[in-house]
């Protein structure tokens, strides 16, 4: 394998594949819903509209997270919502940034641990998304570096918390 060819092939994938995959995915999910009656999105939300606090996760933990949100709303009067990331790559930062804007706190729960890492994989992506939103907020509207992402003022950034679960079936 020639190094230049590998570099060019890797870099060349982005404009021809990555830039279109979100729209293609949305179209496929809509067609799937039409065929089966089951609707999916790249990011699904539960009671997020009025939520102050958000649980972000993926996969089978979402059912329990929704139960926790209901329980905390009923017993503690905390406005908790849930974000289910049904698609990890490409990361749906465009949708997530809008969903988390102005929330007080966000806990990102993952079924993994990386003891020497700064952040767990999902938290890295969430943090990168919110930083892009802050960068948009610092730029003039016509020069936003990430045009599909939300634009955050300093007060729109939620506090972030990270947790892991289900390690060794615990």
Question: What are the language-model segments listed below?
Answer:
Residues 83-89, 163-166:
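Short beta->alpha junction loops
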Residues 45-49, 98-100, 152-155:
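Solvent-exposed alpha-helices and their adjacent loops that cap or buttress functional pockets
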Residues 93-114:
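A structural-propensity feature for long, helix-poor, extended segments
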Residues 24-27, 35, 67-82:
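Short helix-loop-beta junction
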Residues 50-78, 91-96:
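Redox- and metal-dependent alpha/beta enzyme cores, enriched for Fe-S-associated oxidoreductases
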Residues 1-44:
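Conformationally flexible catalytic loops at phosphate/diphosphate-handling active centers
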Residues 107-170:
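Peripheral docking tails and interdomain loops at the edges
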């Amino acid at each position: 394998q020639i190094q230049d060819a590998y570099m060019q092939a890797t870099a060349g994938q982005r404009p021809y594949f990555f830039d279109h995959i979100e729209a293609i995915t949305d179209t496929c999910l809509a067609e799937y819903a039409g065929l089966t009656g089951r609707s999916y999105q790249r990011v699904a939300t539960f009671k997020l509209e009025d939520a102050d606090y958000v649980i972000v996760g993926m996969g089978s933990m979402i059912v329990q997270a929704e139960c926790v949100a209901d329980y905390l709303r009923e017993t503690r009067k905390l406005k908790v919502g849930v974000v289910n990331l049904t698609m990890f790559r490409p990361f749906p930062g465009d949708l997530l940034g809008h969903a988390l804007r102005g929330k007080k706190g966000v806990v990102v729960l993952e079924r993994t641990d990386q003891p020497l890492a700064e952040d767990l994989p999902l938290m890295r992506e969430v943090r990168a998304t919110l930083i892009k939103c802050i960068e948009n907020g610092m730029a003039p509207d016509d020069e936003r570096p990430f045009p599909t992402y939300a634009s955050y003022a300093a007060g729109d950034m939620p506090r972030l918390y990270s947790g892991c679960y289900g390690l060794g079936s615990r």
